[in-house]
């Protein structure tokens, strides 16, 4: 169905669910799975999945990038456990929605699979969710997982 799939991961439960769906789709076509993380400043301390722990509000950019590297590595490990062999990990920068769409275009991705809510959950109610923005801006298929 899809030969290239991009899944943005932020360490949230929603991203973990999206990764599982992306892996199911990737297994159907032996697709390449691009796992993207975009380190963001958070408005509150947040605990991440995959046993990574918490990100402090005052974490520096380099600390957030280091944690982001752990997030994509754990996501890649989880994807391998689900049978995915073609995996590329990416650390992006900038506005999450724009970066997701840009990376998808740059890599010729056929589908983006993302969680409906991520770590910056409350901000989404005010400025619009990342998944909503990606759905409107992307030129490929977008699958939002709840």
Predicted segment positions?
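Short hydrophobic/aromatic patches at helix-to-coil boundaries
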Residues: 1, 142-146
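Small/aliphatic-rich secondary-structure junction motif
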Residues: 3-55, 82
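General small-molecule cofactor/ligand-binding pocket signal
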Residues: 36, 88-92, 143
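Short, hinge-like loop/turn segments at secondary-structure boundaries
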Residues: 50-54, 105-107, 130-131
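A short acidic, glycine-rich active-site loop
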Residues: 54-70
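Structural beta-alpha unit
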Residues: 73-112
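Glycine-rich, Arg-bearing micro-motifs that act as flexible, cationic patches
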Residues: 111-136
């Amino acid at each position: 169905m899809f030969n290239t799939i991009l899944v943005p991961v932020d360490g949230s439960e929603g991203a973990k669910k999206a990764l599982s769906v992306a892996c199911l789709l990737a297994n159907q076509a032996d697709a390449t799975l691009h796992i993207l993380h975009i380190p963001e400043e958070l408005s509150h301390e947040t605990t991440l999945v995959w046993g990574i722990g918490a990100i402090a509000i005052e974490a520096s950019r380099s600390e957030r990038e280091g944690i982001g590297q752990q997030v994509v590595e754990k996501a890649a490990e989880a994807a391998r456990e689900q049978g995915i062999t073609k995996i590329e990990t990416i650390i992006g920068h900038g506005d999450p929605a724009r970066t997701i769409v840009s990376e998808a275009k740059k890599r010729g991705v056929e589908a983006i699979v993302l969680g409906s809510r991520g770590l910056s959950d409350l901000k989404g109610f005010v400025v619009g969710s990342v998944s909503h923005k990606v759905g409107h801006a992307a030129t490929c298929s977008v699958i939002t997982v709840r």
